[in-house]
């Protein structure tokens, strides 16, 4: 609120306004039983380790994705490397969903060798307050 009150009433050129989006994923691991006939899923706390590995991987730079830690070791946040610009351009607005899908695909492929997966869960905006 203090940021809002500090800037309310000021004219800010539209080209200085930027916006973005983020996706928060829960990190899971698939554990196979020794007999190899069944598996179970558990939440993984390897988030910080996998985030560091991903962000130093050339795939991350090429796909313009940055991962950051979220609430616990089992949550990660994926954001674009740069914010969207402020122009109300339909192409930019329509690219948002495509970028979210691309991030999920890249991250899913990255996690396969680690036997990990990601899930998302829609939440009410005020859930964390």
Task: Name each region found by the language model.
Residues 1-129:
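Terminal catalytic/cofactor-binding subdomain
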């Amino acid at each position: 609120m203090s940021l809002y009150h500090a800037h309310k009433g000021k004219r800010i050129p539209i080209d200085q306004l930027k916006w973005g989006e983020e996706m928060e994923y829960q990190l899971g691991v698939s554990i196979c039983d020794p007999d190899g006939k069944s598996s179970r899923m558990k939440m993984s706390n390897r988030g910080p380790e996998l985030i560091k590995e991903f962000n130093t991987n050339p795939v991350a730079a090429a796909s313009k994705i940055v991962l950051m830690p979220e609430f616990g070791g089992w949550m990660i946040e994926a954001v674009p490397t740069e914010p969207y610009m402020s122009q109300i351009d339909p192409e930019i607005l329509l690219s948002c969903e495509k970028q979210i899908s691309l991030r999920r695909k890249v991250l899913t492929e990255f996690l396969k060798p680690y036997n990990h997966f990601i899930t998302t869960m829609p939440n009410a905006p005020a859930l964390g307050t």
